[in-house]
Amino acid sequence: MLEDFKRTLSNMFSWIFTVHSTGLRFSSVALFVAVICLLLNWRAAGVIFLIVAFFCAFFFRVPKINVQFNEDEIASPADGTVLSIKTENDPNSVVIRIFMSVFNVHVQRAPVDGKVGEIFYHKGQFLFADKPEAASQNERNLMQFFHKADPNRFAHVEQITGAVARRIECWVKPGQEIKQGNLIGLIRFGSQVAVYLPKNSVRVVVKEGQKVQGGNTVLALWK
């Protein structure tokens, strides 16, 4: 029966966006409980679970993108607001940090065509994702991406949890070939994504405070 609810939800939202399978699981359970509550005439509870079902579908939405990037363009891996653009621990890299509120799309996409390098997972705390200390203290997962045409060009993506986001999903493996815009992972319920680029090889075209969209916005250009 839950599979029927999953198909129903998927069809309901398909004209606006698709819903990732993770979200369909949450939404279908909430919708199932809502129907039971309404059948038992527990209207308030039924309405609450209907809202939960919609919220889960909305949160795990995967918007359809159809952007063709030029060879010199680096795509944003995430939706959100640019928190900072600066050199941090590595003097040869520039780091673009993107804050994702609970209302942003929370899937991440590959910033370049290329190959996945190493993947580094670090356990940590669950501080608010927009705080500076979250970058070094929170649970995080770093995925290395190397450009298909030049392995010296990289665009590493780091998923960072927040106070509400407490689950990182990584959907790629070391050595995997990847296309720009392909889905690479997800962070649940509000978080931060950092993009590491070679400082002397790129020109950043976004600004702090700017809204960006994963797979749609150009973050930087290769020189």
Pin down the residues of each PLM region.
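Contiguous, well-folded functional domains in the mature portion of proteins
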Residues: 1-223
